[in-house]
Amino acid sequence: MSNTIETGLPEDWEVRHSQSKNLPYYFNSATKTSRWEPPSGTDVDKLKIYMAKYHSPTSQQQQQQQQQQPQGKIRCAHLLVKHNQSRRPSSWRESEITRTKQEALTTLQGFEQRIKSGSISLGELALTESDCSSARKRGDLGYFGRGDMQKEFEDAAFALKPGEISGIVDTASGLHLIERLE
C-alpha cells in the first residue's frame, strides 16, 4: 500500500504491483477499481519521484534478490530419471517405473549429450522428460540450503557455480542432472 502524500495520487488511490504482468498499477480502495494509467487529479511530479524510487526496475530487482535469495542457500533445477530401484519408482509420467538402473543411466546420458551439444536446455528437457513433479517448473527446485536435500544431490549442487550443469548424480530417488541457477 502506498502513501497518498508521497505518491501524489488522489485520496483512496494507491500504487500496487501486478504479479502476472510484473508492472505497477493504480488501485482505488474505496471503489475497488484498478487501472494502468494514473487517475485524474494526480500530482504527476510527485508520482514520477515515487515511481523512480520504488518501482524502477533496478530498485525492484535488488529488493527481489535480497528478499528471495536467503543467506547460504542456492537455487537449482534438475532432471530426474527414476528406475525400478528408486525410493519411489513412480512419477507423474508413469504410475509404475519398470526401467532398470542401467536403462535409466543410458537415457540420462543421452539427455546429457543433447544438453551439452546446445540442442536443448536442461529446463526444456525437464518439462517433458523429468520424473520429478518439478518438471512443470522446468525442473526448478527453488532455494535450498545444506541439509535440505539428499547428501549426494546437495554435494553436487553446492559444488556448481551458477550456470554450470553437473555430471550424472546417483541418489536414492534416481539419477539426476543438476543445473545451478543461482
Swiss-Prot record:
<dbReference type="InterPro" id="IPR036020">
    <property type="entry name" value="WW_dom_sf"/>
</dbReference>
<dbReference type="GO" id="GO:0003755">
    <property type="term" value="F:peptidyl-prolyl cis-trans isomerase activity"/>
</dbReference>
<keyword id="KW-0697">Rotamase</keyword>
<dbReference type="Pfam" id="PF00397">
    <property type="entry name" value="WW"/>
</dbReference>
<dbReference type="GO" id="GO:0005829">
    <property type="term" value="C:cytosol"/>
</dbReference>
<dbReference type="GO" id="GO:0060255">
    <property type="term" value="P:regulation of macromolecule metabolic process"/>
</dbReference>
<keyword id="KW-0413">Isomerase</keyword>
<dbReference type="GO" id="GO:0080090">
    <property type="term" value="P:regulation of primary metabolic process"/>
</dbReference>
<dbReference type="InterPro" id="IPR001202">
    <property type="entry name" value="WW_dom"/>
</dbReference>
<dbReference type="InterPro" id="IPR051370">
    <property type="entry name" value="PPIase_Pin1"/>
</dbReference>
<dbReference type="InterPro" id="IPR046357">
    <property type="entry name" value="PPIase_dom_sf"/>
</dbReference>
<dbReference type="Pfam" id="PF00639">
    <property type="entry name" value="Rotamase"/>
</dbReference>
<feature type="domain" description="PpiC">
    <location>
        <begin position="71"/>
        <end position="182"/>
    </location>
</feature>
<dbReference type="InterPro" id="IPR000297">
    <property type="entry name" value="PPIase_PpiC"/>
</dbReference>
<comment type="function">
    <text>Site-specific PPIase with respect to the amino acid N-terminal to the proline residue. Peptides with glutamate, phosphoserine, or phosphothreonine in the -1 position are the best substrates. It is not only able to isomerize small peptides but is also active in protein folding.</text>
</comment>
<protein>
    <recommendedName>
        <fullName>Peptidyl-prolyl cis-trans isomerase ssp-1</fullName>
        <ecNumber>5.2.1.8</ecNumber>
    </recommendedName>
</protein>
<dbReference type="GO" id="GO:0005634">
    <property type="term" value="C:nucleus"/>
</dbReference>
<feature type="domain" description="WW">
    <location>
        <begin position="7"/>
        <end position="41"/>
    </location>
</feature>
